[in-house]
């Protein structure tokens, strides 16, 4: 998910294009569609609502370039820069199954918002996540689904120039 944090993004992508060798491949994992993974939005909302109770302005500024967070805007940007390369986006949903307690702790780490909390508030958040996972568990196990997109850029020509 490193590409998600890059800002400014355009110089990063242009540098990647410049150093990409003939038949070379650049790949990145970026955010997926929030609605494509069962339960993801609920977990997202639990975490962000909790953090915003403590830090009301949290989320007003995003980390990285916001164009990476939307497949439509990222696709447009990548096609503009890598116009003479093969570009593919593949959606994925990563699934994790574990006991509610373990899953609550592990899942919180996928969200930067949880990292701004004090130890005391973090434990309260984990407790809220555990309660959510307790309600959705089957045979003692709960599931967390994480949406992601895999970007793959392949340089298919000997000259993959920077300027069009």
Mark where each language-model region is:
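Non-membrane alpha-helical structural segments and their capping/turn regions in soluble enzymes
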Residues: 6, 10, 123-126
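Short catalytic micro-motifs in class I SAM-dependent methyltransferases
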Residues: 1-5
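C-terminal alpha-helical interaction module
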Residues: 134-135, 141-142, 146-151
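C-terminal helical/coil "lid" or tail adjacent to the Rossmann-like core of SAM-dependent
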Residues: 86-140
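Hydrophobic alpha-helical core bundles mediating ligand binding, dimerization, or RNAP-core interactions
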Residues: 40-47, 71-74, 78, 104-107, ...
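Core SAM-dependent methyltransferase catalytic element
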Residues: 81-83, 104-107, 146-164
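Conserved catalytic/acceptor-binding region of the Class I
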Residues: 10-11, 17-94
């Amino acid at each position: 998910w490193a590409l998600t944090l890059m800002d400014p993004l355009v110089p990063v992508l242009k540098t990647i294009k410049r150093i990409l060798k003939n038949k070379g491949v650049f790949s990145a994992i970026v955010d997926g569609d929030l609605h494509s993974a069962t339960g993801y939005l609920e977990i997202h909302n639990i975490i962000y609502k909790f953090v915003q109770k403590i830090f009301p302005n949290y989320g007003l500024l995003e980390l990285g370039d916001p164009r990476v967070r939307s497949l439509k805007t990222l696709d447009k940007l990548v096609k503009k820069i890598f116009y003479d390369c093969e570009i593919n986006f593949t959606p994925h949903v990563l699934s994790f199954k574990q006991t509610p307690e373990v899953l609550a702790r592990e899942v919180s780490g996928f969200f930067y918002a949880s990292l701004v909390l004090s130890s005391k508030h973090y434990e309260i958040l984990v407790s809220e996540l555990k309660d959510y996972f307790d309600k959705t568990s089957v045979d003692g196990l709960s599931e967390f689904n994480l949406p992601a997109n895999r970007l793959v850029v392949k340089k298919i020509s000997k000259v993959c120039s920077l300027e069009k």
